[in-house]
């Protein structure tokens, strides 16, 4: 199973990725992890990427795609892989097809912006322990205080409404063209396109995703 998981920040991709990788016995591949591993291993592509990152630049698509091809040739990918957060742009998706990297399925976890803003902006965290609450769905016993220690809860900068809205705008700008690209692909490179309502309960989303993937 060679699959790509799409979904806005806060759509619940991470949770579903764990279910998919466990069900098919495949690794989850993210470009961040891949870059770090290549840099640590000192591969030619890793060294080239490190130089660009050290200079504050963005790693070019040809380097990323070279790394992807190296990564998916490894033994743990013999049954497939799950791409998370890659390809991120139309240029990357087109380059992947040109490089002969095919996909069996593209899974989009679809959640409206208003629901994501509500989910993320309502999160509150106890920093010392990592305990997470939600003002609506999982509130602490005392407003603004951790249940165990009574210490203050904070809202992370990433979860502030304006930040969430900015991240969503970037996601839509970059990724909606991918949705369009994959849903229109034809021939041998055309993956099965699966769109799932991510506002359902986690187990319902899991059942729908795995069912559509043939598990």
Swiss-Prot record:
GO terms for biological process: AMP salvage. One of its GO terms (cellular component) is cytoplasm. Residues 122-159 are annotated as: LID. Residues 30-59 are annotated as: NMP. The keyword Chloroplast does not apply. Keywords: ATP-binding, Cytoplasm, Kinase, Nucleotide biosynthesis, Nucleotide-binding, Transferase. It holds the Pfam family ADK. Pathway: Purine metabolism; AMP biosynthesis via salvage pathway; AMP from ADP: step 1/1. It comes from the Bacteria. It catalyses: AMP + ATP = 2 ADP. Consists of three domains, a large central CORE domain and two small peripheral domains, NMPbind and LID, which undergo movements during catalysis. The LID domain closes over the site of phosphoryl transfer upon ATP binding. Assembling and dissambling the active center during each catalytic cycle provides an effective means to prevent ATP hydrolysis. Belongs to the adenylate kinase family. This is Adenylate kinase. The lineage of its organism: Bacteria, Pseudomonadati, Pseudomonadota, Betaproteobacteria, Neisseriales.
């Amino acid at each position: 199973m060679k699959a790509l998981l799409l979904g806005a920040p806060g759509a619940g991709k991470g949770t579903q990725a764990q279910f998919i990788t466990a069900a098919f016995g495949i690794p989850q591949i993210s470009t961040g992890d891949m870059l770090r591993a290549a840099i640590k291993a000192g591969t030619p592509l890793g060294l080239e990427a490190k130089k660009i990152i050290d200079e504050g630049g963005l790693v070019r698509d040809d380097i990323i795609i070279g790394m992807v091809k190296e990564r998916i040739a490894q033994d743990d990918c013999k049954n497939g892989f799950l791409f998370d957060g890659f390809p991120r742009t139309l240029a990357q998706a087109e380059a992947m097809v040109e490089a002969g990297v095919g996909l069996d399925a593209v899974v989009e976890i679809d959640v409206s912006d208003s629901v994501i803003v509500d989910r993320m902006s309502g999160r509150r965290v106890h920093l010392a322990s990592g305990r997470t609450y939600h003002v609506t769905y999982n509130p602490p016993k005392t407003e603004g205080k951790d249940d165990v220690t009574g210490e203050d809860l904070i809202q992370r900068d990433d979860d502030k409404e304006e930040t969430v809205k900015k991240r969503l705008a970037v996601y839509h700008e970059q990724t909606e063209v991918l949705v369009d690209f994959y849903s229109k692909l034809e021939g041998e490179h055309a993956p099965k396109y699966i769109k799932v309502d991510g506002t359902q309960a986690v187990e319902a989303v899991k059942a729908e995703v795995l069912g559509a993937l043939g598990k």
